[in-house]
Amino acid sequence: IGMPGDTIQFRNGNLFLNNNPIPKIKIKKKYKIRCGTSTPVVNAYQETLPNGKRYIAVYNKIGTMQNTDLYKVPSNHFFFLGDNRDCSKDSRYLSSVGYVSSENLVGNAKIIFFSNDSISGSVLKFWNWNQSLRIERSFNLLK
């Protein structure tokens, strides 16, 4: 979400890019998302970046990232943000993930090859895939 020189911040659960709020529209579909030891049903939103790119993000309002410091992306680095806004280990965790160096980018994602709902079953337990495989997400080309 963040390019070199960009600033990113969450204020009261709202995402700001370069001090501008990212518009989000609530969608009808709800998701059951694991966050720590709880699995709440959460609201989903369509967010739109300044370049017009749209994507779905979920907010469960139980994570610790409702309000963050201001992140300024260094040169030759990028800022990655998970779609589970309140419970993703992403660039906001500077000591463990942090900003991603451009030398660590090795290609472009083209397809979601495999998607598993870990709430319904472990990806390692292939005998449960009939319950946990998210076929509607698997094998989709990325835009």
PLM region spans:
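Soluble "head" domains of membrane/secretory-pathway proteins
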Residues: 1-143
